C-alpha cells in the first residue's frame, strides 16, 4: 500500500473513532517466498522494524503494531513497546569513550525544535575544550564547546548534513539503521542513547 493513501485512510478511521493497526517486517526470519518481510506499507520494507513502527505511530496515527513475519528480536519488541507506552525513543549509537556516561540516560527535547538539529535539555557546562570539531553529518551527536559561550555543554543531534562549525565537538554517531528516527522526534519525545550490541 502507498504511504500517502495509507495515512489518509488511517486519519479517516481515526475520525470514526476506530483503532488502527499495521504490520512491520520482522528482523530475524522473513516469510516465504520472497523473504523480504511483510509490512502493511511498502515504505517499511527493508527498515528496521522499530524505526518502521515509530514512523507508523508518529506519522500515520497507528494504535497497534504487529510483526508481519515469523520472528522478531526481543530487543526490537522491547523498543517498540517502550515507545508505545512511554513515548521514549531508544536510539542506538556510538559515543566516544569520554562521553559514554551518556548511555542509558533519559533526555528530554527542548520545546523550540529547529529543522536541522534536535536539542536536548541537559545541564550546560562552561569551558568545554575544543576537540573533534568535524563536519557534522546526519546522525552526528555534538556537544557545544567553549566557543559557543553560554551554550557550552549543550548536546544536539544533527538531522541533516551540516558544515564544519568550530564551536561544535562531534562526540558520537547514531547507528545508520536508527538515523531515520530523528525525523520523528518532537518536543514530547524523550530519548535514551543505547550502546550498540
Where do the protein language model's features map onto the residues?
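Catalytic alpha/beta core domains of metabolic enzymes, predominantly
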Residues: 1-96
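C-terminal functional modules
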Residues: 94-197
